[in-house]
């Protein structure tokens, strides 16, 4: 049921409707047992937070920071802050001290909510460098706070400031005064170039996004929605809040690396995901099939072929499958695909929005073939996530990012850049009029930085404009497209394509070391460490053969001619990845200059 009211009162309005129905399923800090809270219970917690914030002197449109993993406390803090017209600024739990310091000072944050020990320790170290900071509020009760830290309190103590709702009349007055022009969030994006900017997201953007999403991705109150990505990620934030407007139950996954176990334990019907999640699902399933007997392999390959014909060649194009094909698919769906979905914890799968990077057509077809509705989409922080997406139950094309959501205007510039206008587009960047002016055309269209085109009403993306490489031979290379094709290999964990102003394409590759070590032992390849594996000619030849197989469909000038295996992962700490785990090519070029140059020696 749609309940697109102002976020300042959403939880309370839903509590009137759903009462003691389950709203949040979660695990306590450090505990593996799944618990739940009802709409009524969360509403009461949110009221206490709103009252506590007023007791601390929080003012309308004041910025509050949340530096935490996903948690019940995180969700409640958002709503409690909106209940007094405050602005929340979410930080990634992996943010560096330098990033935190910049965001706190830029937004003049007085109160910073933190999750676990790592976040508390970082916040404490930068406290004296942030003149505006007054208090650190710690969610996890097991965090060891310094005995010499008078500026930190536990969340439980903070909540007591709101006991008996001493300021409830003022809270309700503020909610009555709340405007859709109020800022709800400021999301700082570092991007792949390292420049940090705060994207302003007013309540009006959320309101428009919820209305549009309801017409293409219809969540219902019976859905159980897994929150996999961090709430700092605009895709998860927009998606989770929209699902709450529909009365769905939220499953709060605190640590992304544990999501597959969480899915098996909680059986979600929906979840927003990035392509890398589905790539790992694909590799895991296919690896298990390859290890099975010959009969099982033949059966599964046949089932995939039937699933592809039924779901891709017919249903995706809006056509009715032949009766014989449909009957065979239904039989295989009950006997083969249902077992795969059950193993993944997706036996109740409804649909799964997917965005954040390019999706390999191979992986997308696999997911659809086994009976999971993957709804590919496109969006940015500045567009409050969704710009376009596949619409549930309607035809779609593998390789596109779907049709535009309602209210979005699109234009493709002469340079091929996707330009956007509409009620879900940000008004600009916090404290950065210069960046705001540069981000929009004279007639108000937002410059996405993405190259793309429209075909038959669907949007197709080609590459980030700034990421396009030009080889020394004058050929243009789209590195993300090449990377997405190679990442489906079970032995490849991370990859960075090199080509700009070079005579051919090369790549830095981090293997999946547990699998590579297993391969080496099975083939009597001696090694004492990862460096020896990376340099072993037999390992390199095996990787070369797999890469050549995957890139057969690429143009000759797009194919990786040489590669280097690296013994260590690209890391956040070295600045090689953004907080959303996208590679920073400039930093990689600097950090691995020696290895790159070696690949281009004649």
Predicted features, each with a name:
Residues 36-40, 177, 184-210:
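Conserved AMP-binding A3 loop
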Residues 404-471, 488:
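Conserved ATP-binding/catalytic segment of the ANL
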Residues 11, 55-56, 83-161, 542, ...:
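Structural core segment of the AMP-binding/adenylate-forming
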Residues 469, 494-497, 503, 540, ...:
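Conserved C-terminal "lid"/linker of ANL adenylate-forming enzymes
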Residues 43, 47-48, 180, 199-220, ...:
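Conserved structural elements of the adenylate-forming
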